[in-house]
């Protein structure tokens, strides 16, 4: 341990706060919180730890700490520091897991929508639903039963929905606020669990219609009842009080934490969320960090009640999230927490079982690959591939596999700068030169094996740069493809000789993964650049569209095809003034051949 670390550890306060661990570059690599800073920070440098924590501690060269006045303040500060520094050893929950909601818009003539984006607007949101199909089935039923407007833009004449009795046609008729409120109240009643009462009302109306010999109407009502029964059959009751609640459980093993969340809506268990991540804190601290990030995600709507395991400070959760938090001692809620804990434990056991099998395969693969090539085991492999179409936007990509697995933080993209026209060999020279000049300058780890997606010419270009320009002697191999553009074999040596691998061997599968991954990474980067240049050139002739607006449009739509399909309203939504939106729409509509 560094001497200055011992000195800093000796004067740590016994107060709550946050600590920031730093590596030799001064980069914050981990942020944590503690009820007692002195005890928590010292624990990293004493006693035994699992492999993941040992790796973290091995990188710590310095630390800072911030004293707070309470545990709640420490929790809030920790989340803000994680967002600010994005440390590599902290969990950062992504916003890519979203659930559908049904929304009643706050427009003068309201609509029913399905959305995955819960906004702080005046709309009313119901959900989450376990999947899009479930949300669409419920919306379809409500559309049949309640005649809110369906069209996003008001048409000039009545549409088919009016003739089907599913819309009051506010486009041509006056629909009062009272009428809309009555319909919206019925929908809210249904979505809040009042479907039994509504079903009973429909049943009464069906019998009345039948007695009046209105058989078509009776059949419509019978079908609506059948749809209600079908949807409700899929959502079994587990709680009788109809309160919306999220039930949390967790398990910890071998330095990993799994948190399971059960979404209970209107008494029904509709979905669960599973998150797994490495943990370097006490389990309770890790859980609090997780739950803070969980509800920052816009797709996770705070329910009326949050149910947490007995080991968690529910009072702190309640104050932090401003939602009722409970720790059940008995009954149905306690059973649900135990079920969530059990599922989390099973998920971790499955993960470790798969990891053990995967470790065996990958270790065997890289070990065998080294033997086949006559080199030391290549624990770190770096692979290169070029991509261009007819010489436009030439790019290259480098990926890294460490211990037989992709290390995505090590991936690099390169725009070709010095080569004119489509020259694969010179492009490879440039990229290899840039990559390893920087590696030497910044003392970055060098690979045990370099793989080039190409043949003898590519290998010769790479070897020339490494050995004759940079003085590096790193084993390298070329990946040769067959006539179907699939991995065929390796070539290695000077002159290069083929190395044939068994096609069903783990080392061959590893090479396939490397080749597919570097090709995917390169071609994706090329398409991004090509798409940008196509959109930018397509918009060059439109008055009022400069580089800034081009970037906004590119970010919003992603492709020229989507822009050509967009309406004026969608261009306005993307941030364009109405007159500019009209010009873009007119220009792209006229230019059919773009």
From Swiss-Prot:
The listed locations are: Cytoplasm
Residue span(s) of domain UVR? 196-231
Highest taxon in the source lineage: Bacteria
- DNA damage: present as a keyword of the record? yes
Looking at the keywords, is Glycosyltransferase present?
Answer: no
Molecular function GO labels = DNA binding; excinuclease ABC activity
- Predominantly, its location class is cytoplasm
Q: Enumerate the transmembrane spans.
A: none
What are the record's GO terms for cellular component? cytoplasm; excinuclease repair complex
Q: Which UniProt keywords apply?
A: Cytoplasm, DNA damage, DNA excision, DNA repair, Excision nuclease, SOS response
Q: Could you tell me the Gene Ontology terms of the biological process aspect for this record?
A: nucleotide-excision repair; SOS response
Q: What does this protein do?
A: The UvrABC repair system catalyzes the recognition and processing of DNA lesions. UvrC both incises the 5' and 3' sides of the lesion. The N-terminal half is responsible for the 3' incision and the C-terminal half is responsible for the 5' incision.
> What does the subunit comment say?
Interacts with UvrB in an incision complex.
Q: Which HAMAP family match?
A: UvrC
* Name of the protein described by the UniProt record: UvrABC system protein C
């Amino acid at each position: 341990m560094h001497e200055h670390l011992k000195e800093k550890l000796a004067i740590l306060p016994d107060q709550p706060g946050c600590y920031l661990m730093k590596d030799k570059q001064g980069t914050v690599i981990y942020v944590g919180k503690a009820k007692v800073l002195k005890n928590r920070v010292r624990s990293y440098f004493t006693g035994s730890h699992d492999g993941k924590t040992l790796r973290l501690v091995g990188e710590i060269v310095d630390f800072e700490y911030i004293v707070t006045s309470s545990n709640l303040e420490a929790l809030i500060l920790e989340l803000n520091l994680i967002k600010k520094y994005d440390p590599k050893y902290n969990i950062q929950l992504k916003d890519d897991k979203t659930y559908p909601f049904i929304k009643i818009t706050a427009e003068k003539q309201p609509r029913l929508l399905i959305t995955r984006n819960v906004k702080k607007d005046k709309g009313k949101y119901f959900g989450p639903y376990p999947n899009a199909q479930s949300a669409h089935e419920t919306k379809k039923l409500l559309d049949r039963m309640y005649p809110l407007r369906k069209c996003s833009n008001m048409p000039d004449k009545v549409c088919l929905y009016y003739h089907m009795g599913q819309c009051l046609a506010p486009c041509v008729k006056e629909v009062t606020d009272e009428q809309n409120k009555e319909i919206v109240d019925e929908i809210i009643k249904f979505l809040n669990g009042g479907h039994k009462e509504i079903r009973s009302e429909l049943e009464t109306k069906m019998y009345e219609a039948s007695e009046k010999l209105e058989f078509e109407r009776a059949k419509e009502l019978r079908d609506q009842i059948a749809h209600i029964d079908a949807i409700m059959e899929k959502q079994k009751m587990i709680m009788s009080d109809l309160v919306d609640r999220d039930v949390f459980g967790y398990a910890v093993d071998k330095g990993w934490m799994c948190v399971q969340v059960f979404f209970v809506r209107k008494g029904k268990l509709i979905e669960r969320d599973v998150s797994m991540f490495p943990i370097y804190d006490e389990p309770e601290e890790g859980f609090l960090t997780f739950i803070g990030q969980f509800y920052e995600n816009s797709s996770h709507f705070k329910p009326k009640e949050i149910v947490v395991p007995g080991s968690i400070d529910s009072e702190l959760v309640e104050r932090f999230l401003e939602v009722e938090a409970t720790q059940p001692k008995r009954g149905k809620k306690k059973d649900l927490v135990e079920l969530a804990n059990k599922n989390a434990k099973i998920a971790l056991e499955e993960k470790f079982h798969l990891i053990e099998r995967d470790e065996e395969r990958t270790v065997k693969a890289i070990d065998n690959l080294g033997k086949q090539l006559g080199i030391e085991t290549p624990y770190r492999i770096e692979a290169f591939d070029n991509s261009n179409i007819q010489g436009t936007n030439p790019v290259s990509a480098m990926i890294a596999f460490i211990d037989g697995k992709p290390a995505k933080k090590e991936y690099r993209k390169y725009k070709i700068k010095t080569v004119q026209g489509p020259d694969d060999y010179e492009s490879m020279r440039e990229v290899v030169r840039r990559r390893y000049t920087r590696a030497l300058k910044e003392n970055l780890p060098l690979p045990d094996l370099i793989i080039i997606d190409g043949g003898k010419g590519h290998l010769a270009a790479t070897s020339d740069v490494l050995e004759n320009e940079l003085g590096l002697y790193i084993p390298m191999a070329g990946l040769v493809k067959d006539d179907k553009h699939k991995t065929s074999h390796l070539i290695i040596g000077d002159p290069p000789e083929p190395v044939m691998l068994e096609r069903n061997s783990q080392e061959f599968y590893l090479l396939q993964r490397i080749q597919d991954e570097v090709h995917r990474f390169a071609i994706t980067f090329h398409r991004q650049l090509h798409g940008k240049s196509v959109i930018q050139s397509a918009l060059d002739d439109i008055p009022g569209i400069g580089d800034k607006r081009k970037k906004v449009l590119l970010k919003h739509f992603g492709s020229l095809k989507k822009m050509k399909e967009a309406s004026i309203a969608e261009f306005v939504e993307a941030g364009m003034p109405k007159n500019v939106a009209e010009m873009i729409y007119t220009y792209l509509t006229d230019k059919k051949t773009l």
